[in-house]
């Protein structure tokens, strides 16, 4: 089946549009069922992209393919990604037998590693918690530590698979602000997988909708940051994305 993409708004070509990630004809199948269907996609260097879709649409499969974590699936196509890739999941995946700083430094080497780890923890608001155990952290603090762990590797590409899905509403808003600030400071390419349309609109500069294993909508959010949920124009983007997801809202 041929891929199809609907581009509602096109960003002007700039030096930053050099692809950090490039997919050509990417296909992935499980038990004879096609989950990703010949996807062609470019993610420019430094772009913040969000990926929406129903459960089972292939969002996490696409992220895992880009991360190189899908060795046991049947697939084809061409995939190019940067060498330095960090992944943040919904579960912080902190090792309970290691202190926070040791978790952040896991897999890193060099004399400056500890200093970089402390700096990363300070960036996410966890200065002074280096010696804490993971079970002493709140859910939001654990995700902050996970972000610090990703930052210390100085990634060219940050993949985030519903990182705030288990957090309460207020903590999610705070984490939205933090993630955007970290992106503006470090400028990695970001691919954020989420079920939350509002989260995608507030954070991302481009939103993709995955539908039956294909990119059904490719929408550039051409609005300055910081953004407010109350902006009327964001409501227009929201309606387009919900329509692409097959959701309609009744307005009184």
Which residue stretches match the model-derived regions?
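Conserved structural motif at the start of ABC-family nucleotide-binding domains
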Residues: 21, 36-38
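The feature captures the beta-strand-to-loop junction immediately N-terminal to the Walker
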Residues: 52-54
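Helix-to-loop junction immediately C-terminal to a conserved catalytic motif
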Residues: 67
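Conserved ABC ATPase signature
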Residues: 133-137, 141
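Hydrophobic anchor residue at the start of the ABC signature
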Residues: 147
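A short, proline-enriched helix->beta-strand linker immediately N-terminal to the Walker B motif
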Residues: 152-156
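Catalytic Walker B motif of ABC-type/P-loop ATPase nucleotide-binding domains
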Residues: 158-161
């Amino acid at each position: 089946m041929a891929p199809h993409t609907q581009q509602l708004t096109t960003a002007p070509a700039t030096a930053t549009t050099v692809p950090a990630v490039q997919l050509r004809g990417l296909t992935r199948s499980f038990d004879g069922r096609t989950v990703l269907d010949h996807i062609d996609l470019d993610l420019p260097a430094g772009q913040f992209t969000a990926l929406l879709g129903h459960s089972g649409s292939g969002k996490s499969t696409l992220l895992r393919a880009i991360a190189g974590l899908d060795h046991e699936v049947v697939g084809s196509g061409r995939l190019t990604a940067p060498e330095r890739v960090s992944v943040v999941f919904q579960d912080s995946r902190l090792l309970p037998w290691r202190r926070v700083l040791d978790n952040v430094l896991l897999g890193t080497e060099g004399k400056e590693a500890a200093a970089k780890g402390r700096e990363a923890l300070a960036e996410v608001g966890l200065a002074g918690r280096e010696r804490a155990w993971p079970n002493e952290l709140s859910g939001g603090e654990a995700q902050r530590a996970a972000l610090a762990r990703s930052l210390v590797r100085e990634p060219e590409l940050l993949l985030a698979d519903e990182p705030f899905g288990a957090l309460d509403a207020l903590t999610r808003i705070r984490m939205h602000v933090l993630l955007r600030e970290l992106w503006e400071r470090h400028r990695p390419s970001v691919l954020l997988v989420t079920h939350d349309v509002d989260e995608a609109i507030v954070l991302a500069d481009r939103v993709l909708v995955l539908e039956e294993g294909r990119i059904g909508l490719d929408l550039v959010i051409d609005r300055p940051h910081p953004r407010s949920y109350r902006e009327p124009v964001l409501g227009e983007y929201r309606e387009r994305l919900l329509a692409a997801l097959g959701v309609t809202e009744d307005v009184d």
